[in-house]
Curated annotation (Swiss-Prot):
InterPro entries: P-loop_NTPase, RapZ-like, RapZ-like_N, RapZ_C
Function: Displays ATPase and GTPase activities.
Protein name (record): Nucleotide-binding protein TT_C1664
Secretion signal, residue range per the UniProt entry: none
């Protein structure tokens, strides 16, 4: 299991980093007391979670008397984000947020927070100065450090419209215009994973429609990757989610795997009715 502690100065990008880590599959928890980290990791392991992260900010340090002891015992990867004081000041002025230490003098609060977090900074495996970084630049820095340079993932999810489209879908492709194996008694019990079903679905007349779907999915995924996203979900739907959508999702995966890391999920392939 990978265990990561994300910390650093308020306004340096922890919210952006937290979201990106979640996109990479980390289960993230904010300001959990260190004495609860071992039970968290035990529960995560029992549930099959491979990546866990805890966000720590200066407000919580007063309640973290056992932090050093737990860090020494668990030895998590520590990522620390910082920025120059004038940059943090500008960011706070733009967002009109109140500093978490909230004493009323922003520059003094930034200095106090930096002193309070000095111990964690000294333990950091990665220190990122975000003063000149865009959100995308921060994500790229984290991806390089975590070995996720190829971290963009294209998810293809087949489904049946009768069961509703996946809520997480960024793009929905409708493959109901393609030939339907449901009406062939010999093919009806099979799924889109079957070669005979695939041949039926991808008849010569169906090829132009499929090529258009392939182009749309590829362009959408390229755009998402260019924006710095960690993953993009394309849902492929037919009526029941057993034949056409499965066949198309599989073929899309085959043809797009040379451009992206691809994951295929057949949500409704085992459903009847």
């Amino acid at each position: 299991m990978r265990f990561l502690v994300l910390t650093g100065l308020s306004g340096a990008g922890k919210t952006t980093a937290r979201g990106f880590l979640e996109d990479l599959g980390y289960f993230m928890v904010d300001n959990l007391p260190p004495r609860l980290w071992p039970p968290l990791l035990q529960e995560a392991a029992a549930r099959g979670l491979a990546r866990v992260g805890v966000v720590v900010d200066a407000r919580a340090l007063a309640f973290f008397q056992d932090l050093e002891e737990v860090l020494e015992a668990l030895r998590p990867t520590v990522v620390y984000l910082e920025a120059r004081p004038e940059v943090l000041l500008r960011r706070y002025n733009l967002t009109r947020r109140v500093h978490p230490l909230g004493a009323g003098n922003l520059m003094r609060e930034i200095a106090e927070e930096r002193r309070a977090l000095a111990g964690l900074r000294g333990r950091a495996h990665l220190v990122v100065d975000t003063s000149e970084l865009s959100p995308r630049g921060l994500k790229e820095a984290l991806a390089r450090f975590l070995g996720e340079e190829g971290g963009f993932l294209l998810r293809l999810v087949s489904f049946g419209f009768k069961w509703g489209p996946p809520q997480e879908a960024d793009l929905v492709l409708d493959v109901r215009p393609l030939p339907n194996p449901h009406y062939d008694p010999a093919l009806r019990p099979r799924t889109g994973l079957d070669p005979e079903v695939r041949r039926y679905v991808f008849s010569e007349a169906a090829e132009p429609y499929y090529r258009a779907l392939l182009a749309v999915a590829g362009l959408a995924a390229e755009g998402a990757r260019a924006e710095g996203r960690a993953f993009y979900t394309v849902a492929v739907g037919c009526t029941g989610g057993r034949h056409r959508s499965v066949a198309v999702a599989e073929r899309l995966a085959e043809e797009l795997s040379g451009r992206f890391a691809v994951e295929v999920v057949h949500r409704d392939v085992e459903r009847e009715g």
